[in-house]
Amino acid sequence: MLFRSEVDPDTFEVRPLKLTAVQEFGRPIHPALAQGQIEGGTAQGLGYALLERVVMRNGAMANSQLTNYTIPTTLDMPELDVVMLENPYPGGPFGAKGLGELPMDGPAPAVVNALRSLGLDVREIPATPELIASCTAAA
């Protein structure tokens, strides 16, 4: 996963510019569906990295509605390049391996590494403007 972004120095908001998702999962049986799975999982992973925070109060989720639990929309998504590396797996049907939710795994580490390249000691997600501001103050 390659992630390119900008961080607003005044608001500490991360603006994703481009994501490149590289996935190896054997031979894709249905390439268009595999592409969609990668795009959707990458969007979920980006939301997990930048937006989605679970708030618990008295053992219950306090932000369980779409009005107060922020998830990414198409307007939040950067340019996305998907690269599928075909490497047929002899133990799978028609050379396939599982794809599943694998695309969700890359965005959070990519976002944190991008922020660390700016000298920010980010140790948790989501990397909200408030968190980035606190990392800036601690630096």
Residue map of PLM features:
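Cofactor-binding beta-sheet edge motifs in enzyme active sites
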Residues: M1-A139
